[in-house]
Amino acid sequence: MRIAALLCFALLAANMAAAADITVLSGGAIEPGLRAAVAAFEKQSGHAVRVTFNTAPQIQKRVEGGDKFDIVIAPPAVIDPLQKLGAIAAGGPSVGRVGLGVAVREGAAPPDIATTDALRKTVLDADAIVFNRASTGQYFEGLLKRLDLWTAVEGKATRYADGASVLDHVKNGKGRDIAFAAITEILLYKDKGIRFVGPLPADVQNFTSYTASLTPQGSGSAAARELAAFFATAQSKQLFTAAGVE
């Protein structure tokens, strides 16, 4: 019995030694898909993954400031300059892309966004247009300028650092407040007082793509390399797709 107990203890110790903690810094728009993929990876590998979510500008600032993570998942606007600095490795797998959607509070009449002309009228008629200061919001502000709407609506534009704050604002609003946010973030609020109206019209839609890149710290970790490789598998892609990440 004593020998059997010692063998069990030795096996347990070996498994604990083999397991590793992996740290990931990621954009928040892919949170639903990433959490599902990470859960599957943890179950299969025995490794523990700790994920921190930030906006794209915050990710760049943190990595450039010396914060240490094994894997960074972000849009090209962040990945490219960090690669040039040598802060992350090139050639990481794409985890998918996220489109821009429109939302109102539950119970509010859904605005017409079927066409770009309809979207234009909806924006002009809104009491407030609410969007973030991250990748999604940067694109949307640029779109309003291209549609010659920015001057007319700038005064009723409300900006937040992240998508959650955008949706909380609209959820708690009373007028014709409209949120423009990543579709994945909107879907997280579908049972929390937010109604998903739909994606932007195809001719003005924008997809933000996300790439998983190893840092120098992560490149030296077999477990981190294993997770990066997992993101390229069909299983991972299916989990991201099911969560709205194309």
Model region roles, listed by residue range:
Residues 4-15:
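Bacterial N-terminal signal peptides
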Residues 20-57, 61-67, 73-85, 89-98, ...:
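Exported/periplasmic ABC-transporter solute-binding proteins
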